[in-house]
């Protein structure tokens, strides 16, 4: 990412409106989007989007508008119970083909999928790409990763 100056409060307000309008349209037009909510408690410009999946029945995608970037993340699964090396190798190899997204280890060693873009790239098309990619990558990776990291639960 380039070292663009931080967005002004007015620019952030404009990006916030783009995100809010896009989310409202997604709720109406995208059957995978079940709900969205603005996080008003934190004082940050953050939204949580509830998504219905197939491999993973439901998950939430966070959009966090910062001064220089829009950060996107979703919780994928807890830390593996077994086959740790194989599990993390699997996710690291998947990172090569995730088009600007990365699997990351978060609190309590949980697995998250994250991405970010410069605020100047926030458009409806880019928001579509971010949400669509999050959906696709969770759907592609969830079951194989679960079968590795929780293998004994899948026997029988």
What do the PLM-derived regions correspond to, one by one?
Residues 96, 135-146:
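Short amphipathic alpha-helical signal-transduction/dimerization elements
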Residues 146-156:
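Short, highly charged C-terminal tails/helix-capping segments
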Residues 70-112:
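Short, internal acidic amphipathic alpha-helical interface segments
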Residues 53-58, 65-70, 77-81:
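Short, charged/polar surface micro-motifs in flexible loops or helix N-caps
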Residues 51, 74-76, 115-119:
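Short beta-strand-to-loop capping motifs
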Residues 104-137:
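A short, solvent-exposed beta-edge/loop patch
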Residues 1-56, 106:
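Charge-rich, low-complexity N-terminal segments
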Residues 53, 62-65, 102-108:
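Short glycine/proline-enriched loop/turn "hinge" motifs that connect secondary-structure elements
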